[in-house]
Structure formats: C-alpha cells, structure tokens
Curated annotation (Swiss-Prot):
Keyword rRNA-binding: yes
Keywords: Ribonucleoprotein, Ribosomal protein, RNA-binding, rRNA-binding
Any GO molecular function: rRNA binding
Stated role: This protein binds to the 23S rRNA, and is important in its secondary structure. It is located near the subunit interface in the base of the L7/L12 stalk, and near the tRNA binding site of the peptidyltransferase center.
Binding partners and assembly: Part of the 50S ribosomal subunit.
GO cellular component: cytosolic large ribosomal subunit
Protein known as: Large ribosomal subunit protein uL6
Organism of origin: Alkaliphilus oremlandii (strain OhILAs)
Keyword RNA-binding: yes
Family: Belongs to the universal ribosomal protein uL6 family.
Amino acid sequence: MSRIGLRPIEIPQGVEVKIDEKNFAVVKGPKGTLEQQLSKDMEIKIEENVINVVRPTDNKKHKSLHGLTRTLLSNMVEGVTKGYEKKLELVGVGYRANKQGDKLVLTLGFSHPIEMVDPEGITVEVPSQTEIFVKGINKQVVGNYAAKIRELRKPEPYKGKGVKYANEVIRRKVGKTGK
C-alpha cells in the first residue's frame, strides 16, 4: 500500500500557494503560475510552510485520490521552482530536428518534413540536429508534448532508428537469418 499522500509538501521560499474552499489550487513561483482543480473530497491544509492532504475516510476511492492530490500539488510546487525537462534523441540516417520561430521542424524519413507548433508554456530547444529539449513548468504538458514528438517515429527494435527519450533503453531483436 502506498503512503505517498501522508507525506507533507514543503513550500520553498518565494512560492505562494492558495487553495480555495472548492480545492482550486493556484501556485505562484519564480518560474510562473500554475492553476489546477483538485479533488473536492480531499481536505488540504496549509500550515506555515507545509501543505498536508487529509482524506475523509479510508475507502478505496479516497485512498487513491489522497496520493494523487498530494502528487499533483507536489508537481505544481516543483514546477514553479525548478521546472521540468525531457530530452529526446533522434537516431537514424537523415533524421534531423531544427527550430523555426515557435515551430519544431522534424525530418524523420517521410516524404515531407513535419512541423509542430510549440504549446503555450513550453519551450523547445534544439542544441544539435539530433537532440531536442522540451522544457516547461507543467509536468503533464511537458510529458505529453515529448510523447507526441516520440509518437511520430517510435524507435524500432531491429536497428533502433527513431525518436527516443535520452534515458530510454530499446530492446533489440535479432533479424532473420538467411539459409
């Protein structure tokens, strides 16, 4: 059984957390502001520089919402202080990425280049033609955008070509053997 919900969340200096009676959370920090509607079933208490999430009962639904609510708040606090980053790598001959204004242009072996417009609150950096950094304060948006880029050309198991996360290990397969 997970006990993540029981852990308190430290509020760093320079971060302001406001939660109204309907559990609408607003977290302001040095990198920006995040807003999110949290579960109305949970009771969120802010005492000095610590946030505690309390569940009303021990039924299964409340136990799962307890950990979720605590993690969402923790991600918001970490996002406005440190931010989030996903690194993607392009593996394959002729696979390239470059930036044109707010568009990411990918050449992934198709007959046409793929243009992707950066979502609001996300910055994309292309330090080299085979590296992409997706940065932002909202963990969910950063992860979703990185997953969309990876989905365009997933790594294949025979040669490992495609778009992969920097820390991802691709399980390789052995090709067919001739007679």
